[in-house]
């Protein structure tokens, strides 16, 4: 869904995305091997987190539409990661299910920022296809609470930005080595 929103984010200085790691079959195997009673107790190593993210990126790219808009979005996504404008981290110890979008305004703005929370994932389905429900919170206390909680989780998260780029460029249809004749 990035291709659908990036034009609206062009003037944004910095974008931080924090993702949770879903409980897939590989995760269940790790839980069984480690005798962890719940996912809440599970803590991925940095390597396991990056490997899981690699699979998620490959799956997202496989399911993406084969259009010029998606391809432009992927180029922009990689460009923003390489420039430092976009940073993606994965939280290794619990699946983050909450959908929270925090906007921080410039210093001279009327207020510090806003929070949007609700059911929309940052995917094509969540942004375009599904019927979703979201709420904008304008209260400064809500903004501060969300910002503090996000920063708390961010500091313990694993940077997976380069893993995104590496996976897209080496293990998906976006790779230069993938040709119609290969």
What does each model-identified segment do?
Residues 1-182:
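PLD/PLD-like phosphodiesterase catalytic module centered on the HKD motif
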């Amino acid at each position: 869904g990035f291709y659908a929103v990036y034009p609206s984010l062009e003037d944004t200085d910095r974008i931080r995305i924090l993702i949770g790691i879903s409980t897939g079959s590989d995760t269940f195997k790790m839980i069984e091997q480690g005798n962890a009673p719940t996912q809440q107790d599970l803590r991925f190593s940095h390597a396991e987190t990056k490997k899981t993210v690699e699979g998620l990126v490959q799956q997202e790219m496989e399911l993406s539409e084969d259009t010029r808009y998606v391809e432009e979005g992927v180029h922009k996504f990689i460009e923003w990661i390489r420039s430092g404008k976009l940073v993606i981290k994965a939280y290794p110890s619990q699946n983050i299910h909450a959908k929270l979008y925090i906007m921080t305004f410039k210093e001279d703005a009327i207020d510090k920022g806003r929070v949007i929370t609700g059911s929309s994932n940052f995917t094509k389905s969540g942004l375009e296809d599904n019927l979703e429900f979201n709420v904008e919170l304008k209260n400064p206390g809500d903004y501060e609470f969300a910002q503090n909680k996000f920063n708390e989780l961010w500091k313990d998260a694993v940077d997976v930005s380069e893993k995104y780029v590496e996976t897209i460029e080496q293990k998906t249809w976006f790779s230069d080595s993938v040709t119609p004749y290969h």
